[in-house]
Amino acid sequence: MTSIAHLRKSYERAELSEDASHADPLQQFEKWLKEAISAEIPEPNAMTVATVASNLRPSTRVVLIKGYDERGITWFTNYDSRKGQELAGNPYAALQFHWVELERVVRIEGIVEKVSEEESDSYFHSRPLDSRIGAWASPQSQVISGRSVLVANAAKYGAKFLLNPPRPPHWGGYRLKPDHWQFWQGRKSRLHDRLRYTLIEPASTLPDAKPVWIRERLAP
């Protein structure tokens, strides 16, 4: 075995206390995300998405969050991809943000559903032209003979659609509806701060109703 055990650092940038954290995990997430953006961390919107196949084999990939609100965390992708196929069979997933420079991790778990056709259309048409063509050109997660396949497909669909490609039927958005959040702040001596939020009562249909969360500290 090649040892890399010497690669270690002491986490001493900040702390995470119950008093200083929000009772609502979405507000705490928004606070940390804004701080990551302000710190000019490369791609602070990058998150790992973990799904599980029917044979119980997990898989992960990095995608970019495109929005969040009280309904959940939203991203867009190819529905025919491996993650799309796995979500079709098992709609539960986990997300993770790792902001290394701030010594922070956010973990989110919940059930995933597709966003509306209108929401997918709206985001798709806001993308750069080459990205919209790319959504047609790439048979995501399928084996191809070489990069030339992608180049040829991009040329074909670029010529076909010119400046106005429609959204492919196999492409759109997902939204994870959180029922579990964890916030991790690195601390000295590996005595890290971990706060877990568990949903105990979803928001009702009454106006201005808010979900009820229980917040607990976990040992690191």
From Swiss-Prot:
Lineage: Bacteria, Pseudomonadati, Pseudomonadota, Betaproteobacteria, Burkholderiales
Protein family per UniProt: Belongs to the pyridoxamine 5'-phosphate oxidase family.
Cofactor note: Binds 1 FMN per subunit.
Enzyme class of the recorded protein, top EC level: oxidoreductase
Gene: pdxH
Names of required cofactors: FMN
SUPFAM superfamilies: FMN-binding split barrel (SSF50475)
Assigned EC number: 1.4.3.5
Subunit comment: Homodimer.
Native species: Albidiferax ferrireducens (strain ATCC BAA-621 / DSM 15236 / T118)
Name the UniProt record assigns to this protein: Pyridoxine/pyridoxamine 5'-phosphate oxidase
